[in-house]
């Protein structure tokens, strides 16, 4: 009975370790062939994805001569390894080059800034004898917003003009006008914008014209992501995978709880 209690407490302590463990990959260089002569290590590395935190075992590196050397890939980028025994690299191709990817997750794209669609004149639309400056007052136009000019086709049109054309009601050539009856203009740049109707007297006598100031686009919401965990010390196992401990403090607490519980029950 006491043995069953001890085993149960051990399992509780082991479960306490699990939140502190994350999965990494341990690559046995050359698989069953290992690190040796006359082996195509580039073919072996092809299609493998090496990430920060993974390990190579046993790869060659300066000062590693144990026969089971483990290197943790701590930084992204190109990595090169060779055997330093004479002729092993030059004559027998005992060398390896890999590309290590960043283990941090890619940040989510920034949320696009909200855009506003303005129907010029609201329910009155684009027509004569409407005070469009009063309509525009109090509105904040930003880059990316749109203006919708709604009117009866053939009765009005829309021209974008400069300040002089706006003040004197001078319309550009007819080919530059918008005439669909439902003209949508995207505000692509900040600054002053002027629009008029090109029909005779509509601008000069009936005030069918609009001037607005467009502000720069609002700042986008920056992406938020958690930083990648710092690579820990891998534990070598035979399956080709390894566990890396991300929090020694959690391990200590889990072990202390297990020991305390066992001593209480014995």
UniProtKB/Swiss-Prot annotation:
Primary location: membrane
SUPFAM superfamilies in alphabetical order: Cupredoxins
Keywords associated with the record: Copper, Disulfide bond, Electron transport, Glycoprotein, Membrane, Metal-binding, Signal, Transmembrane, Transmembrane helix, Transport
Pfam families, alphabetized: Cu_bind_like
Listed InterPro entries: Cupredoxin (IPR008972), Phytocyanin-like (IPR039391), Phytocyanin_dom (IPR003245)
Domain Phytocyanin residues, every copy: 25-56, 57-102, 116-216
Keyword Kinase: no
GO molecular function: electron transfer activity; metal ion binding
Residues annotated as binding Cu cation: 156, 197, 202, 208
Gene3D superfamilies, per the entry: Cupredoxins - blue copper proteins (2.60.40.420)
Name of the featured protein: Blue copper protein
